[in-house]
Amino acid sequence: MSQNPAHFSLLPALLILTALVTVAYWVSYFIGGDVRVVDARWYTAFESSFPIADAWLAVTAFISGIGLWRGTAWGPRAGLLAASALLYLAGMDITFDIENGLYALVPNSQPMQFELLINVWSAALGIVTLVVSWKRG
């Protein structure tokens, strides 16, 4: 990490954290259901279609976090993969939540509050990762 700017220490940590939280989310979703906003079939059908895509997100976030942390040449390239996965997830989730009126549940629903956090986190981290990786790569 010899010539990396200070934000390169934070970004890898956030990407690795994102990978770990993504795995924890799916464990909760399938085992306890605590993160489910509603139990209706239309909702679970949509959410249940994401584990493979989110696994890709977790893998690319973890790998890019390691690569950026170590200052490797491939770290920024992996960062572009992670950024695209984060932005795609944000776009899909935000569109679904708007079209189904789920943001109206935010004041009284902890799962929806967490969903909102995921939406903001994915969009913001996706943009930051894209910009940093593009400049670095």
List the model feature ranges, each with a label.
Residues 1-137:
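Topology signature of small-to-medium multi-pass alpha-helical membrane proteins
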